[in-house]
């Protein structure tokens, strides 16, 4: 069976959903837009570059490409601390993934199922 091709857009989707999970919020809760600033201020939630690499299940090159794209789009901030990277989602990142998760689910359904075939589908895909 041929491997299903995944591009950096779907990897960005995986990374953003991982960052939302680190915040511990319900992405679809009512009134989220009004709460985002307070949530981001109250919680020091971040993931490492290694955690992003693990989530997207790809190599160092693709991990860097994904992080750089998310940073360029304003969806994350990246802080280097003692040789390690702390990646945090921004308000724009939360609003983007909330708006486009349904689109990603429709367009990339085969790739998402393939990506999570051994771990089980993530909460945001169900």
Model regions and ranges:
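Short acidic, hydrophobic short linear motifs in intrinsically disordered regions
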Residues: 27-55
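Short, cationic-aromatic polyanion-contact patches
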Residues: 32, 81-103
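A short, conserved structural fragment
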Residues: 71-81
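Short, amphipathic alpha-helical interaction segments positioned at domain boundaries
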Residues: 94-121
